[in-house]
Amino acid sequence: MGFQDQRSKEAFARANGVLPGGVNSPVRAFKSVGREPIFIAKGQGARLWDIDGNSYLDYVLSWGPLILGHAHPVVVGAIKAAAERGTSYGAPTEIETECAEEVIKAFPSMEMVRMVSSGTEATMSALRLARGVTGRNKIIKFEGCYHGHGDSLLIKAGSGALTFGVPTSPGVPSSVASQTIVAQYNDLEGLKEIFKECGEDIAAVILEPVTGNMGVVLPQPGFLAGLRTLTQDYGSLLIFDEVMTGFRVSYGGAQGRYQIDPDLTCLGKVIGGGLPVAAYGGKRKYMEQVAPSGPIYQAGTLSGNPLAMAAGLATLKLLQQEGVYEGLEKKTARLAEGLQSIAQELGFPIWVNSVGAMFSAFFTDQPVIDFKSACSSDVERFGSFFRGMLERGIYLAPSQYEAVFLSAAHTDADIDYTLEQARDVLKSLG
């Protein structure tokens, strides 16, 4: 019968009547890839099915959380069992403590943890904590790194050598933006200049240690270590946003992989097993300043929700099984390297960055090491590639600047099929 999407088109038209842009998160609208979105009916293992009956190999995995694949029976069973006891209590439960203990085992830099419900909550709360314990107001973020939609973080680089931020969204006051300095990822020398200029005013530096939101960009040798030394020298806190990389580039995240301990860490995605969970944590001396043990306020009605904790704990236990990460990394490398090889064979300009169970294929012929080089990608050509792959049953993120994620449910046969389809699509693009 071939690819059909009439029901998805009708569903999108209906959604546009009640949801801004027809979606509840902008990238889902498929605007950057030149088509309307598909509407999902169900997922199982490495596959999705849409409401038109099309089946896809899924490399989005709910934007990263589903490292075991869709509807893993153990995770689903844990959610069902928890739901039968009650969906929410707004009171302490033992499973919150169990989850926190597992996180702390995996991330030794996190001596205490506070559970929240979204990555945005985690980063906003970590920044408030950093400002509270240092008594300083300014923060540094990196261009191209995304940390949720908090006002302090919806900032892009302004003009001038000392790059004070300007808002990327209406509704963000310029007074808030002026407290955020935007640096360039992998540019340690530029960061040193910023610290020389105003280091005594900087509460924290926040970054994705491996970026995932301008596509996957890896830290250059010495960058993270230099950043750790620089923040210590000036008494600023180093915050790793590992919402995406935590439990994905290794069980202990990017900090475990690169052996760099931040002061605070933000987690999300995988730790919820597909349900809304995030966390922030770090050294005890800082976390004890969080209410109610300290004066720095943070709260949430659904924080530590028992269904989400059950899903997260079940996921982490399964990830501890022998060979899980070795298998994930091998499959990811085979897909990433296979795509690179096909592109080279066809004379097609693609640059691949890969780590752990995530990678990006940038439609450019130059190395991608920062935001500027990521932006050299041909987004129109990527859009054509995306559409071709979608119609062949391969569901990729609908943006050049998002990661490809693999799960334990993906098989070698899945990867073979994906590479076959990629070859056909790239050939058709010339």
Curated annotation (Swiss-Prot):
Swiss-Prot/TrEMBL cofactor(s): pyridoxal 5'-phosphate
Any one Gene Ontology cellular component term annotated for this protein: cytoplasm
Record's protein name: Glutamate-1-semialdehyde 2,1-aminomutase
Gene that encodes the chain: hemL
SUPFAM superfamilies per UniProt: PLP-dependent transferases
Pfam family membership, one: Aminotran_3
PANTHER family to which the protein is assigned, alphabetical: GLUTAMATE-1-SEMIALDEHYDE 2,1-AMINOMUTASE, GLUTAMATE-1-SEMIALDEHYDE 2,1-AMINOMUTASE 1, CHLOROPLASTIC-RELATED
Positions where N6-(pyridoxal phosphate)lysine occurs in the chain: K269
Recorded family membership: Belongs to the class-III pyridoxal-phosphate-dependent aminotransferase family. HemL subfamily.
